[in-house]
Amino acid sequence: MTLLTRIKTETILLESDIKELIDILISPSIGTDIKYELLSSYSEREIQQQELTYIVRSLINTMYPHQPCYEGAMCVCGTGGDKSNSFNISTTVAFVVASAGVKVIKHGNKSITSNSGSTDLLNQMNIQTTTVDDTPNQLNEKDLVFIGATESYPIMKYMQPVRKMIGKPTILNLVGPLINPYHLTYQMVGVFDPTKLKLVAKTIKDLGRKRAIVLHGANGMDEATLSGDNLIYELTEDGEIKNYTLNATDYGLKHAPNSDFKGGSPEENLAISLNILNGKDQSSRRDVVLLNAGLSLYVAEKVDTIAEGIELATTLIDNGEALEKYHQMRGE
């Protein structure tokens, strides 16, 4: 039975099946047509949680058989694929969170389905990505590291053409935030598909995170939003996964439609992020950053409650520390 047949007919795939799939997808010598058929078929099936863990571990082990660890490190990112074309919320959040002293290893990529991915924005900011080997030194000095996915996982470049061909979210969108080269203590992940929240939360637990939040934003975003109830799966320190809804209005933030968060080109997104960090933007765009930064600070144990996290994020922007972190990352 071929791998394609097994993907289409088997309820649960073996770890060996997953390894075969990954080996094909990262091969430079196998044609895009074959990869397209396998990846599109796999992304249409009901993915089992153990399979997602197999995929993540297969990719990590391929590049980092002895995965490095930085105690207390956190990643804040989304799966992408929500087609919202929002500005770079999680990248902006990273500056705020790192300015609180959280060790942030932000793992990002160029855009697949939007106008500007995190790496596109960093290029516009003149902020260099950091190598995996140099990450501890920069974390010690600046508390913030941006690692480009194509640099940390050069094998992923062999998947990019087929992802572009498919033109919609695939299993790789779920995988992206989970393959940080470093073993993380904390993580906050936004997921484009609400039906995958529990799947991702359980996988994050399998990966050994201490605390995490996996969320789906109201009305379809992969960030917490201001437009309604956000769906939250929280991994607690004792290993429990609890789910609940979170509405920004309960924390003193005004309701706003997701359309308020539309971004544009990397140049336009730079202006948006900078005006939030320097305090000039007091609109709902600032509020959505405060909400996501507050959640991140709560996960990273900088505060005891989400409300305190939002309050701390507000202070970090208003007192200039978040902007100072931006300038520090630019070498200024």
Curated annotation (Swiss-Prot):
- Catalysed conversion reaction: N-(5-phospho-beta-D-ribosyl)anthranilate + diphosphate = 5-phospho-alpha-D-ribose 1-diphosphate + anthranilate
What does the record say about how the cofactor binds?
A: Binds 2 magnesium ions per monomer.
Residues that bind 5-phospho-alpha-D-ribose 1-diphosphate? 78, 81-82, 86, 88-91, 106-114, 118
User: What's its EC?
Assistant: 2.4.2.18
Keywords assigned by UniProt?
Answer: Amino-acid biosynthesis, Aromatic amino acid biosynthesis, Glycosyltransferase, Magnesium, Metal-binding, Transferase, Tryptophan biosynthesis
Q: Which residues bind anthranilate 1?
A: 78, 109
Swiss-Prot/TrEMBL cofactor(s): Mg(2+)
Q: Which residues bind Mg(2+) 2?
A: 222-223
Q: Where does anthranilate 2 bind?
A: 163
Which GO cellular component term is one of those annotated? Answer: cytosol
This entry's Gene Ontology molecular function terms read: anthranilate phosphoribosyltransferase activity; magnesium ion binding
Is the keyword Metal-binding in the record?
A: yes
Subunit structure, per the record?
A: Homodimer.
Function summary = Catalyzes the transfer of the phosphoribosyl group of 5-phosphorylribose-1-pyrophosphate (PRPP) to anthranilate to yield N-(5'-phosphoribosyl)-anthranilate (PRA).
Question: What HAMAP family does the record point to?
Answer: TrpD
- Name of the protein: Anthranilate phosphoribosyltransferase
Q: Which organism is it from?
A: Staphylococcus aureus (strain NCTC 8325 / PS 47)
Gene name?
trpD
